[in-house]
Amino acid sequence: MEATDQEVMLEGREDLMSTSATSSTNGGDTNGCGKKLSVTSPDPTPYVTKQRVTRPTPPAPSKNPMQFVQIKPCNLYQTAQEQLKKAEEVKKLKEVKKEEPEEWQNNLDNWKSSRRKRVEHIIDRAVETKKLELEEHDRLRRKSKTFTEMMEERAERGGPRGRAKLASLAVYNEDETNDLSDLGIGTSSASGKSSLSGDYDNNSVMSDHAAELDKAIGAASSVAAGVTAQNVDEQLNHINRNGSNGNHGNGAAVGQTGPSNSSKSAGRQYISSPGYDTSSSNAQASSPDLCEYTYEGAIQDYKQRVQRASSNGNGNANGKLIGEHIAYPTRRGSKIEDRLSGFEVTSPSDTQEGVEKQKVDVPKVDISKRKEIFEQAKAEVSNGGAPAAPKLVFRDGLTNGNSATTAPKSEVRRLSGDISSIRDRMQSLEQQRKAFSSSKSVDVPVPPLKQRLNSLQQSVAKEEQKKPPLVALIDARQLEIMRGEEERMRQQQQKEKHSPSQTTLCAPKPAPPALIIEEPPVADTNDDSGIQEDTADELQQQQQLNAAIAALALEERQLEEAANAVNQIEAEFDELTDLHPSPLPPSPALPAVQQSLQQPTVAQVPAQAVNQAAAPPLRDMEFSVSCTNNFIEPAKISPCDVNVVAASAVSVSKSGPTPNPTSTPNMVSSSPNCNLRRKPSNEMVHHRNLLKMFKETFQNDDDLKEVCEIVTSPGQFTQIIDFSKRPSNPPIPIPTLLPTSTPIPTQIPRPLGKPPMSPKAVRLASSPKGHINPLSSPTNSGFSPPQFSINGRVEIFNSRQLDKPPTPPAPPKKTVRSEHPLKEAVPSPEVVMCAPPMTIVDPDELPKPNTVKALSNCFSQSDSKSLTSPIMSPKPLPSGRIPQITPPASPKPPKRVQLDEVDRSSGDYAPVVGQTKAIVHTPPSKINARANQTLDPLAPNDSLCLHTSSPSEIPSLKACSPNESSLFKLASSRPTSPSVDVASCQKFLNREAPKDIQLAEEDRKRMDQFAVEEMPCDKIDVTKSPQPNTGFQIVTEDLVKKCDGKNISEAVRDLDVPPSQEDIALCAGLLDCLAPAQEPICDSIDVRNGPVPATGFQDISEEEVKKCEKHNKNYVITNRPSSPIGSVRAAHSKALMDTCEQIIAEERKASSQMMKTSLPESVEKPSTPLPGRKSKIPIPKPCCISASGTDSISRAGYVPTAPSHLSGSAQQPLIARTHVVETEIKVKEISPPSIPKTPEQTQLHASPTKEKKAKNIFDFLRRNFGHQEEPQHHSTLNETLEKKVVLTSTKSGVDVVNADEFVRVDNSKFYLASELEDVPVPPPLPKTPAPVNIEIRKKITTNEILEENTTEQALTQEISDLLDDEIMKLEN
């Protein structure tokens, strides 16, 4: 390749060489033999000699003629050429080396600039945010000087050592706006860029206090390591020890006291780091260092910042109010610091005090923690002085004798007023529950209820004072609590009437009295007049109080176990438990309750006592946390073990001054408050009124008219509870009284097995075997702790004053509807409750109502005979007033309670679904009718009788997808995926599920029988699946022959005689429609390849139509002219053609006259287009324009070439005129006329009609529309401008059918156009024009400037008059 290049180069440069010989001399070969000879020379470059390859080499001469001739270039040329090559190579190399560093530098510069631009707005935002935080922090510090006051007090208590310690504290001046490390921006914190001095170097301070810095860092690390291993109690003790030893300075050890005192004597020259400026130091304010920012320095700075942050965090936990000193490397200012320093630049005239005021700052510390630490320290130092602020303690009353052990643990609890977030509140509540559960046992005697209620009031009072006016979000559980309270009042009223008939109930001892609670706050008395007693039975009163205290203790234990299940909203509900408690007489009664509960025959009495006395005191419908008590003992679950005593209160009673008009005077005494009554506040009244509004929507006027009676057949399952007092009669296992009717309940029944937190109805097992049914409530609170679940919640807040309420505000609620399937007399298994899955959603992203399926959809009812009560339509919530409670009729205890109750309220938050658990009951063995039934609809008729029932099988369950979950838990601020929901649901169910369930063999068989086996879905190919039978059959030719009854011989014989085309068409059509449809056996059919099912009609393709026309040529020809549409269409088309031709001809004729009258004569030019005038007379759709030589409408826009003789209007010269005429002509046919009999009659009849109509249209167009123009001067343009639609004429073979005629003409036949050329021409069309309705609309826009008399108004008036005249003519 190199030789070839050299050869080419030599070829181009032969003129520069002395010779172009084909050979060169060689020292060793004087004869010059060989084809290629190299030249011996200092130049190592080989040169190729030129040689013809095609010719043979000539014989070498005896002597080389070129022996003394040098054929190569001169040495100077070669040297120059080499230098040029080297120069080019060097140039190329230098260019490459020169480009690389420039490109790298450019990339680096671009990266730096882009990074600055990208981070610039972040820095600005961070600086602004820090500045705002600093301003707010300074404002808060000016408002509450807790740090200064506490340090002064500590200095006074500590004496000279305390003052020395106070003096040794370093208060840093650095603005926290300069520290952007917590924002993710690793900037330098050297911000002491004050204008007081510019030559101060922090290295001097660093060198002066190097030893102290080392000690400070060592002490900080040691303290940080020690603090992590201490609990909160040890931290508080460590704070006290530091305060007594005098080491409570800046977190240093005891060995630092020397440097601290020396720094104090030197005028408080504190240890200063590059980022901090001492507030009272004698040194000048530091200016930013001028060294470059390096990565090593940044890394070291980051490490030291992390160490400082950790030491500060531990120091804050231990009460160190000032962060430890950290030796920073010397760093200079950066652009970020320049921007940051702009916020704290001061004038030189400012004094040191002004600088201190501007830059005083407190190290990062949590204000709430700081206040709590110092308040606790002050309380301990005062040695029994004033007690500290009340902590958030719910169960101080239960500690009783163990107050000494729980005292240090109470220190852990934070002040309720200082809780900064819901997460902190939740953690504090969990710590309280853990501390309480670790220190409390069931056997501890319960202190008086008065003390406990007072402690609850103290714990909530401070938080409630900070709360805005209350707004309640109440679900079905709170409404059930309310109904239970009203129900007890009605039970008490009915008990007064039916006390003689209540003696046969199953009660060994008198039942505890019911809590009669009235809705309006009548008085603040605290007597026992609401409790009806036959005698002054002090033992029974004590029993009631004991049961109430036992229920409260059980509640608290359930609250402790629910700490992991409640969500963040429930944490706030625990703080809103009560506002105004009232004391109750003390009575330690838990042992008594346990003794009474151990007796199976007497088990129901304490249960009712717990039901009634454990109810939360009436606070005008204000309730605390709504939770459900799951009385299940995991160790003892045997469905067939014992009978179940089911009791529930499901009705809402009517409340008023005199709820029952026929009540006895004893009823009046039940109106005053009971011993749990508390004085209502404004928030309580608001809460109560809100619930009244809810209750008013629940009531139904029809319920008041029904007889309040219960029909309970022996096969029915009843759940009722009796709150009335019963005498101590011998126990009768089955009550002898029965209701007789069961009205449809409209209120929400309480879900079985899950009474509210303050239970109104507790299920107790009354078993002669002495065992406790695990599916019912435990009879002794000393057993294993009952499980707990969340069913409802109450959140109280003011949506107008809160930025973002924890949960959506309560919209107007509608009726909470629930279904109660009624059973027949046949006993059947029954699922009362089940635990639904949970879905974690965001309050702002909750679905709309009625989008979540009820939990009952997940269960299949095993009882096919069960009836569902109709769901009452909810009433609209009355707005604009707070209605009083209008009580509905007391609903009867349902025979069966639905699986769940869903609040289908219309609002922006999801329905709250009551969480239930499966309890299976069977009908009672025997139920007797009850005597002395009352007919008063308002009288309480459901004083409940205890019925025993035994558990039965659990019916089958249907698979429920995670998306159909009906319980929402607001635990996080973001929605979770279905997989997370499934996991959380499974975890919750596993935790709540009773352990060690042992089912009987029979029950297990029944469960297996009703269980639904879930099979995985198989992929099904639609194309391979059999197609469903359509009931039609494809009609084949053989089937047609078979249906005709022809055999093969007849068919062969018929082939000899060709049938007529008409017979073939008729036979095929009839047989296709009348063929019997046989249903073949379903088989695998490929839809794409299978035949189309017969539908009774025949699919006619275009080819078949052509074929039919070809075969039935004569038949079609004979029928087509006789069709009624033909004649009608012919007459109509002729009339439209004549009319339109006349209209267009007259407009052309009058165009020249109109142009003459509208423009002066000077502008007349032949064939000059007029853009201002545009005739918009459209071609009517139903008509056509035949090629009759007439001009089109488009010609009207041209000026005539011949001068017009009508120049009367030209006497008035016009300066300018723009005349636009828009005309629209619509031709409508009135009705098709009948076919004319003879053409002669139609011709005679057509002449006068055509002249009259033409005259009217002619006059109208001539005077108003047309420009008069001679038609012979211009050729027609309609053929060239647009194509015409030509209808049927005498010379046309095309039959065009208008779309409007398809509908208007009956009994007509239409044919597709045949492509055959030999289609005969139809007869001539008649001459009679069809009666048409021609509607003409004209819009004239004239803009002209007249020089003389003619005005725009006069011309417009003239045009209007002419138009009116023509319209009148057309109408006449």
Curated annotation (Swiss-Prot):
<dbReference type="GO" id="GO:0005911">
    <property type="term" value="C:cell-cell junction"/>
</dbReference>
<feature type="region of interest" description="Disordered">
    <location>
        <begin position="860"/>
        <end position="897"/>
    </location>
</feature>
<dbReference type="GO" id="GO:0008017">
    <property type="term" value="F:microtubule binding"/>
</dbReference>
<feature type="region of interest" description="Disordered">
    <location>
        <begin position="1231"/>
        <end position="1250"/>
    </location>
</feature>
<feature type="compositionally biased region" description="Low complexity">
    <location>
        <begin position="184"/>
        <end position="198"/>
    </location>
</feature>
<feature type="region of interest" description="Disordered">
    <location>
        <begin position="486"/>
        <end position="531"/>
    </location>
</feature>
<dbReference type="Pfam" id="PF15949">
    <property type="entry name" value="DUF4757"/>
</dbReference>
<feature type="region of interest" description="Disordered">
    <location>
        <begin position="1"/>
        <end position="67"/>
    </location>
</feature>
<feature type="region of interest" description="Disordered">
    <location>
        <begin position="380"/>
        <end position="414"/>
    </location>
</feature>
<protein>
    <recommendedName>
        <fullName>Uncharacterized protein CG43427</fullName>
    </recommendedName>
</protein>
<keyword id="KW-0175">Coiled coil</keyword>
<feature type="coiled-coil region">
    <location>
        <begin position="539"/>
        <end position="580"/>
    </location>
</feature>
<dbReference type="GO" id="GO:0030036">
    <property type="term" value="P:actin cytoskeleton organization"/>
</dbReference>
<feature type="coiled-coil region">
    <location>
        <begin position="409"/>
        <end position="438"/>
    </location>
</feature>
<feature type="region of interest" description="Disordered">
    <location>
        <begin position="799"/>
        <end position="820"/>
    </location>
</feature>
<feature type="compositionally biased region" description="Basic and acidic residues">
    <location>
        <begin position="486"/>
        <end position="499"/>
    </location>
</feature>
<feature type="region of interest" description="Disordered">
    <location>
        <begin position="238"/>
        <end position="287"/>
    </location>
</feature>
<feature type="region of interest" description="Disordered">
    <location>
        <begin position="1151"/>
        <end position="1181"/>
    </location>
</feature>
<feature type="compositionally biased region" description="Polar residues">
    <location>
        <begin position="257"/>
        <end position="287"/>
    </location>
</feature>
<feature type="compositionally biased region" description="Low complexity">
    <location>
        <begin position="514"/>
        <end position="523"/>
    </location>
</feature>
<dbReference type="GO" id="GO:0150105">
    <property type="term" value="P:protein localization to cell-cell junction"/>
</dbReference>
<feature type="compositionally biased region" description="Polar residues">
    <location>
        <begin position="860"/>
        <end position="871"/>
    </location>
</feature>
<feature type="compositionally biased region" description="Low complexity">
    <location>
        <begin position="652"/>
        <end position="673"/>
    </location>
</feature>
<feature type="compositionally biased region" description="Polar residues">
    <location>
        <begin position="399"/>
        <end position="408"/>
    </location>
</feature>
<feature type="region of interest" description="Disordered">
    <location>
        <begin position="652"/>
        <end position="679"/>
    </location>
</feature>
<dbReference type="InterPro" id="IPR031865">
    <property type="entry name" value="DUF4757"/>
</dbReference>
<feature type="compositionally biased region" description="Polar residues">
    <location>
        <begin position="17"/>
        <end position="28"/>
    </location>
</feature>
<feature type="compositionally biased region" description="Polar residues">
    <location>
        <begin position="1151"/>
        <end position="1160"/>
    </location>
</feature>
<feature type="region of interest" description="Disordered">
    <location>
        <begin position="427"/>
        <end position="447"/>
    </location>
</feature>
<dbReference type="GO" id="GO:0005915">
    <property type="term" value="C:zonula adherens"/>
</dbReference>
<feature type="region of interest" description="Disordered">
    <location>
        <begin position="178"/>
        <end position="199"/>
    </location>
</feature>
<dbReference type="GO" id="GO:0016331">
    <property type="term" value="P:morphogenesis of embryonic epithelium"/>
</dbReference>
<dbReference type="GO" id="GO:0005737">
    <property type="term" value="C:cytoplasm"/>
</dbReference>
<feature type="compositionally biased region" description="Low complexity">
    <location>
        <begin position="238"/>
        <end position="251"/>
    </location>
</feature>
<feature type="coiled-coil region">
    <location>
        <begin position="75"/>
        <end position="143"/>
    </location>
</feature>
